[in-house]
């Protein structure tokens, strides 16, 4: 009798996705982050659902409803802290997942990569609208500053901003629609993740050597299902540690004050995971230029497959490109630090240099190095 796992129409799909999936035998722990992102997404949807049961999307009660969740709801403090810190962990996993793709040349699977970039943007939008919901000072002013950037769009800018606000300022209509978006988008992300996986399984996974691995593949289960569990354990332990010992470590103290349109916080800044993009935005003194740089800082990822010049796929055997990759990582960390600093000398200058370096690495230095490496190897 044939195994039901291989014949049942539904179970067969699951089987081909996570059980009998042919996987390169040499993939490292860096390939763990895809499944970790799945775990993060499920955690966020579950905790978010429970929070939505008690939250009220109205400017008069939003802040106090969050306080009510933390004080009066059974384990509400735990659900809220897990949701807030889960977002930070989600972004750590995303950035490591993207870094792995850049290092090992996974971006040459173009469809998977492009859907991945769209997923990144969807997650960033979801996190932004979610940050507005507690209706603290930083929530309100963050929403005001970031939505205001759309006024830089020529001709239709002001109309666009008012359309998003649902009025002439960030108000009740804005909060209500942001809650609607924050509730809806995770399910859109889930759907896009399935498409991401579908495209990935068309070609199969890349591996650390960047070579064809058809001759040496193993089943995903039990080898990598157990290997992934170690990653789950480490990630969930980190999340539990953050949530139970330092729940407010990554938050902004300003958000413990209810939103007040009449007083501006001394430093308006987003959550830590957006600071690199915020630093790039601030490094250009022109409003439209800053907005374009902000969007380009993410969309530049779409150009990576087009600008791949090397005859080799990954950076495993390319020491010069490896140096540039780690320079990019260092540059991102510098931008993250600068994004949290006030707009004054020397931070502005450092931010401008780091922003130029960021785009130069993607658009000029790494493609040129690939070409030079080909020349050095006589691979014309």
Swiss-Prot record:
Question: Which residues hold heme b b566?
Answer: 97, 196
Gene3D superfamilies in the record, alphabetically?
Cytochrome Bc1 Complex, Chain C
The record lists the membrane-crossing segments as: 33-53, 77-98, 113-133, 178-198, 226-246, 288-308, 320-340, 347-367
Q: Does the keyword Disulfide bond apply?
A: no
Q: Which cofactor does it need?
A: heme b
Query: What function does this protein fulfil?
Result: Component of the ubiquinol-cytochrome c reductase complex (complex III or cytochrome b-c1 complex) that is part of the mitochondrial respiratory chain. The b-c1 complex mediates electron transfer from ubiquinol to cytochrome c. Contributes to the generation of a proton gradient across the mitochondrial membrane that is then used for ATP synthesis.
> What name does UniProt use for this protein?
Cytochrome b
Q: Which organism is it from?
A: Latimeria chalumnae
- Taxonomic lineage of the native organism: Eukaryota, Metazoa, Chordata, Craniata, Vertebrata
């Amino acid at each position: 009798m044939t195994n039901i796992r291989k014949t049942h129409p539904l179970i067969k799909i699951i089987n081909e996705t996570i059980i009998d999936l042919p996987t390169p035998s040499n993939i490292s722990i860096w390939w763990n982050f895809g499944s970790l992102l799945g775990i993060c997404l499920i955690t966020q949807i579950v905790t978010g659902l429970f929070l939505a049961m008690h939250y009220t999307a109205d400017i008069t009660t939003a802040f106090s409803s969050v306080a009510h969740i933390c004080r009066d709801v059974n384990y509400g403090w735990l659900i809220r802290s897990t949701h807030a810190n889960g977002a930070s962990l989600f972004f750590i996993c995303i950035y490591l997942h993207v870094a792995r793709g850049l290092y090992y040349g996974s971006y040459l699977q173009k469809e998977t990569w492009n859907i991945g970039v769209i997923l990144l943007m969807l997650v960033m939008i979801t996190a932004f609208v979610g940050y507005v919901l507690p209706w603290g000072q930083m929530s309100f002013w963050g929403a005001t500053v970031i939505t205001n950037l759309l006024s830089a769009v020529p001709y239709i800018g002001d109309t666009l901003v008012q359309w998003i606000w649902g009025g002439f300022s960030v108000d009740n209509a804005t909060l209500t629609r942001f809650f609607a978006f924050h509730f809806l988008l995770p399910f859109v992300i889930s759907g896009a993740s399935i498409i991401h996986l579908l495209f990935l399984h068309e070609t199969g996974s890349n591996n650390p050597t960047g070579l064809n691995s058809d001759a040496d593949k193993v089943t995903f289960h039990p080898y990598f299902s157990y290997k992934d569990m170690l990653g789950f354990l480490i990630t969930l332990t980190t999340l539990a540690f953050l949530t139970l010992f330092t729940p407010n470590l990554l938050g902004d103290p300003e958000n413990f004050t209810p939103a007040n349109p009449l007083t501006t916080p001394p430093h308006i800044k987003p959550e830590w995971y957006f600071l690199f993009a915020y630093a790039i935005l601030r490094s250009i003194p022109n409003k439209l230029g800053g907005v374009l740089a902000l969007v380009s800082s993410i969309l530049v990822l779409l150009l990576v497959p087009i600008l791949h010049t090397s005859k080799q796929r990954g950076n495993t055997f390319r020491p010069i490109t490896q140096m540039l990759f780690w320079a990019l990582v260092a540059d991102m960390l510098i931008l993250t630090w600068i994004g949290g600093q006030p707009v004054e000398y020397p931070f502005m200058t450092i931010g401008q240099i780091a922003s130029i370096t960021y785009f130069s690495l993607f658009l000029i230095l790494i493609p040129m190095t690939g070409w030079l490496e080909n020349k050095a190897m006589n691979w014309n």
